[in-house]
């Protein structure tokens, strides 16, 4: 393919802008939560795979954690198994857990691994059960109403939270030039499987690895103020204030709290980025403008 002169100049400008960022992040680990629209569009899937391969090629270490809620819901529907949710979490009985493992650990994980490898990477698929990668425990959910003297305990089945991450395994893979692709399934002390929110797994993996960045792909342009303007850079204190005044609410809260926990736990920065934008990951890392919201532990 021969580029026109103008196109060649544009490519050179892009590379020139990216070079300082490449130098800054060489040898660093970035944890990317992959989900939403970015997993559904063929164009976006291809762009994501190329982004990941390029990062590895220039010496950055990406670790991918993926979701798969819509795919789980589709298979449950085809199997005539009812999907039930409590506070946004899928109630996961033994039958549903079998489907979760089949979809996340099988179909979705292997599709992502295959796509990255087709574009020149060396991805390796994992669930949290492999070598005890994600040790988990049952998530306790309670509900309190004014008329209750004690909180109601709600059993949502095999839904878990992360207790620990096998960083030795991940570091071995990363240093061996592999790209880990992790399905958010944890394993309990008794060998029980647990369905865990992918954002939470990504956050805990980033925290355990002391990653440079945690990047959460979403279906929005980033965090917005009450006038609908994207907030491109925030400190943890500013995010806390936006939660307190109701600017951040609803379904975005768990994602933001995950980002806050990661940054306060040693991750240099967390990013809420627009996964609907082609090459969103590269744009956020390697350009001055980015495509989302950057959260750090620094003021301003």
Curated annotation (Swiss-Prot):
Q: What is its main location?
A: cytoplasm
The listed locations are:
Cytoplasm
Q: Which GO terms describe its cellular component?
A: cytoplasm
Task: Tell me which EC number(s) this protein carries.
Answer: 2.7.2.8
Quote the record's binding site residues for substrate.
68-69, 90, 195
UniProt-listed InterPro entries: AceGlu_kinase-like_sf (IPR036393), AcgluKinase_fam (IPR004662), ArgB (IPR037528), Asp/Glu/Uridylate_kinase (IPR001048), Glu/AcGlu_kinase (IPR001057), NAGK-C (IPR041727)
A GO MF label: ATP binding
Q: Which reaction does it catalyse?
A: N-acetyl-L-glutamate + ATP = N-acetyl-L-glutamyl 5-phosphate + ADP
Report the SS bond pairs: none
Instruction: List the pathway annotation.
Output: Amino-acid biosynthesis; L-arginine biosynthesis; N(2)-acetyl-L-ornithine from L-glutamate: step 2/4
Q: Which GO terms describe its biological process?
A: arginine biosynthetic process via ornithine; L-arginine biosynthetic process
Q: Which Pfam families match?
A: AA_kinase
Superkingdom of origin: Bacteria
Record site: Transition state stabilizer? 33, 255
Q: Which UniProt keywords apply?
A: Amino-acid biosynthesis, Arginine biosynthesis, ATP-binding, Cytoplasm, Kinase, Nucleotide-binding, Transferase
Q: What does this protein do?
A: Catalyzes the ATP-dependent phosphorylation of N-acetyl-L-glutamate.
What family does this belong to? Belongs to the acetylglutamate kinase family. ArgB subfamily.
Q: Which HAMAP family match?
A: ArgB (MF_00082)
Spell out the protein name for this chain: Acetylglutamate kinase
Highest lineage ranks of the organism?
Answer: Bacteria, Pseudomonadati, Pseudomonadota, Gammaproteobacteria, Pseudomonadales
């Amino acid at each position: 393919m021969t580029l026109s002169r103008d196109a060649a100049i544009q490519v050179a400008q892009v590379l020139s802008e990216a070079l300082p960022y490449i130098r800054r992040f060489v040898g660093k680990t970035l944890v990317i939560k992959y989900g939403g629209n970015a997993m559904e569009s063929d164009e976006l899937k291809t762009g994501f795979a190329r982004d990941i391969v390029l990062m590895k090629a220039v010496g950055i270490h990406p670790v991918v954690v993926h979701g798969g809620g819509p795919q789980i819901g589709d298979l449950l529907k085809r199997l005539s198994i009812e999907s039930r949710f409590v506070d946004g979490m899928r109630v996961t009985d033994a039958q549903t857990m079998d489907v979760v493992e089949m979809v996340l650990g099988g179909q979705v994980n292997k599709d992502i691994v295959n796509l990255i490898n087709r574009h020149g990477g060396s991805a390796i698929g994992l669930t949290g059960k492999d070598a005890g990668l994600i040790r988990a425990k049952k998530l306790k959910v309670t509900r309190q109403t004014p008329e209750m003297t004690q909180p109601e305990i709600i059993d949502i089945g095999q839904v878990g939270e992360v207790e620990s991450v096998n960083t030795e395994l991940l570091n071995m893979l990363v240093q061996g030039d592999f790209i880990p692709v992790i399905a958010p399934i944890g394993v309990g002390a008794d060998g029980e499987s647990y369905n865990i929110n992918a954002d939470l797994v990504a956050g805990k993996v980033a925290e355990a690895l002391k990653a440079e960045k945690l990047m959460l792909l979403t279906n929005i342009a980033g965090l917005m103020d009450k006038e609908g303007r994207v907030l491109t850079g925030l400190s943890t204190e500013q995010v806390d204030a936006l939660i307190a005044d109701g600017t951040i609410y609803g379904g975005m809260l768990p994602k933001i709290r995950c980002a806050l926990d990661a940054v306060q736990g040693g991750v240099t920065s967390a990013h809420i980025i627009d996964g609907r934008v082609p090459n969103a990951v590269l744009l956020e890392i390697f350009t001055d403008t980015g495509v989302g919201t950057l959260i750090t532990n620094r003021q301003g």
